[in-house]
Amino acid sequence: MKIINITYSIIFAGLVFLATACSDVVTYNDGYDDQLASYGPPSVSRITTAKDTATIITESSLAEMITLHGNNLTDVTSIFINDVEVDLSTIYAVRTRLTLPVPRILPMEADNKIKVTTKLGTVSVPLTVNVPPLALSGLDNEYAAVGDTVNVNGANFDLYEIVDGKGKVYFGDIEAKIDTTTAEYVAVIVPQGATQGDRIHVVGPLADMYAPGRYMDNRGLFQDIDHYQGWTGQNWFTDVSRPDDPKPCSGLYTRINRTLGPWEWFDFIASWYPVFDGTDCFDNPEKYDYKFEVLTLIPLKTKGIGLIFQTGYYWEPGKIVEFNTNGKWKTITVPLEVVMNGMKETNLPHENGHVGFQINIAGGESETIDISFDNFRITPKD
């Protein structure tokens, strides 16, 4: 009997505990508003960027994330910026806030408005979208051979539909086949019949312009290695007789593959050159570019390349990040006024109408390099 009483006592205590525990259950507010429903036509009080929701904007750029602030901004059925429709899968909407990307598409007609339509109405507010131009910076290798693929570099090629079937790229009057298009470049195959000095002409549905520079530009060519008459560096010239030599871009080139110690100075080009173009390039360096082709088989890290018209200018492509062309020839363009460092032709020492020039590698830490050069030239800016 005593055992039965103890059992009843335990059961009763358990029931009391459960009753007490149930009394501690939290009751949530059934009136919680998740802001996913709208109750009237949409309204917009201001527009900001998605990053800075405190600063009102009236202008935006393609691909920028923006936020509309207002009321009843859910249940969206369409959004247009100018005449470009926004993909609704890219938006985030609650009743008082609507975040979306400005589509990276050129409008055919611009009314400078954003129009939002929901199940309960439509609102239209002013918004100017700044459209970037097609920008061309030139061929990534001006000495690419016929049949090779070369990039016309720049910006917004995809935006302006410089693509196969819609856009065209010409070498002079000869059309090149478009291989690949990205925002930063259009890759084309150098066509049969492309001629030294050809301008590169880019045409699209909404663009028609010429790239700076020319194909195999030999204007102002003062050192192409094939006709070198200097006093040092000939032992680094190659005719691709070694099995590991890269394919040349035009005849002989100089290839330096060795280890240089810290701050070791190494000259590989040194000569006197005729002062061409009536010295105009030195009197007006802002009108000219200094160009050459370069190829690396090992990334260049800390060494600088001296391009010296008695001015001490150093080209240091690896100063911030490693410079590497990945075994491909690339054209390097440096404004001549940067190379000249503000000096004028009259400051340069002459010898029988010639100007001294040398190229060296120096500075930095101990480094193994494998770098090739060709076609040093000073060309007018197009």
Q: What name fits each language-model region?
A:
Residues 143, 212-224, 364-382:
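Extracellular polysaccharide-targeting segments
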Residues 270, 276-277, 283-342, 369:
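Extracellular ligand-binding interfaces
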Residues 292, 334-370, 375-376:
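Extracellular beta-strand ligand-recognition surfaces/modules
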